[in-house]
UniProtKB/Swiss-Prot annotation:
Name this polypeptide is given: Uncharacterized protein HQLF3
Spans annotated as Disordered: 90-114, 133-156
Bias-annotated ranges (Low complexity): 96-111
Organism: Human cytomegalovirus (strain AD169)
Amino acid composition bias (Polar residues), ranges on this chain: 147-156
Family assignment from sequence similarity: Belongs to the herpesviridae US1 family.
Length: 156
């Protein structure tokens, strides 16, 4: 899940749709390690911060801590509010209703206490290119700047 986190913010355009996609990923990934069919129960249980990372506990505790950490990281890819548990515990119907509301109103979609418009909470990450692609674009940009500089020098 960690390798595809950037894909969540790129493939879905509106914030309510990103939240729904995040919920679907959390739900599907929960079903891989637990059969309780209620992933929100694992969010409601408040772990101390030291327990968010897998420790020396048994397999279920290790899997739950790892899952919580990944869901938290996936939330932070698409939203800047810092309240991943609040988003997880909110009902799906409320998220769907907010997606149907007028996008021109710019009301807070995710939490009642936060009055920032949705587009301010949105995290936009630039794609990370492999090192060879970065070197190529840097070289291409520097060559282009040099040719433009040469044109400017010849015209003046």
């Amino acid at each position: 899940m960690a390798s595809g986190l950037g894909d969540l913010s790129v493939g879905v355009s509106s914030l309510p749709m990103r939240e729904l996609a995040w919920r679907r990923v959390a739900d599907d990934s929960h079903d891989l390690w637990c059969c309780c069919m209620d992933w929100k129960a694992h969010v409601e249980y408040a772990h101390p911060a030291s327990e968010l990372r897998p420790g020396s506990g048994g397999w279920p505790e290790h899997a739950e801590a790892q899952w919580r950490q990944q869901v938290h990281a996936a939330h932070d890819v698409w939203c800047n509010c810092g309240d991943w548990q609040g988003h997880a515990l909110r009902s799906r119907s409320r998220t769907a209703e907010s997606g149907r509301s007028s996008s021109s109103s710019s009301v807070s979609v995710l939490s009642d206490g936060d009055q920032q418009p949705w587009w301010r909470r949105l995290r936009v990450k630039r794609p990370k290119f492999p090192s060879w692609a970065r070197r190529w674009t840097q070289r291409h940009d520097s060559e282009e700047r040099a040719s433009q500089q040469a044109e400017n020098d010849s015209t003046s």
